[in-house]
């Protein structure tokens, strides 16, 4: 029979446990805080938001919506306007410069460790009044149709711009090259409707890359983490969660997060929440903004650039940019002299260095 031994020593009065250690907040403020230099072991958290780019301009009364969707009656005669197309939103944050000497063997770089994000304005999807199509045919009776339909939610955090792949439903669609960025018409073919590895790009501008024909490139983006979901359907109810307790880890399988090149952080987002249906059955895409909170730390890395390349870049960039005729196809002959030799018997002799570094002499025919 076992016995339970009781601790007969009562706890001493006045002794308490120590508080749990948490990160020490030393600076808090707006964008001006980014200019301050902090210690080597400090972390930085940046809060920002990206507004949607659904097609309507920032001055329009329908900002946050696309223009009316116009289904085409013919594949060869489609009337597509660029305001119908939701696009990706892009934000770039300039981080504090960490290195005063770029010639050192070891450098400090900002590394994105984790982020918190959510779609802001989910509450607006509960609006069931106003100038929208109603379920009841009687005027002024019954609720209006809420936002419903296609849901596309995407965000990316990286140390450089998001690398993207062009793929579309119909390569004959008349995209406007001046208002949106798409490959030239002469490069589009039926291969554009599947994966054409020649149609790649970099998302370097806000509000000009249409969502329907650009997607993140899975074969690249080693320095970017992206996340996305899609729910199709014309009348699909939006399903969105919002909380400030979920943290997304940005580290890869080696424990390394996106390294911010040139001390810049790139945020990309697109959030399509469905269609707004008007009384005349016209439909517009509805987009919502996205909030981001990104935590960064300082990471020691090996300097990937030798001093020679840095100096070469410095001298090259000091020259003014010029636009000239294309010389690659107009240069007829190049001669390089080095040292001396005996007088050759053929003044038109052609010699060159092959790709293996060996000297070759062409025998005349």
Swiss-Prot record:
It holds the Pfam family Polyoma_coat. Residues 307-365 are annotated as: C-terminal arm. This is Major capsid protein VP1. It is found in: Virion; Host nucleus. GO terms for cellular component: host cell nucleus; T=7 icosahedral viral capsid. Belongs to the polyomaviruses coat protein VP1 family. A DNA-binding domain overlapping a bipartite nuclear localization signal is present in the N-terminal region of the protein and is required for efficient virus formation. The keyword Metal-binding does not apply. Its main location: virion.
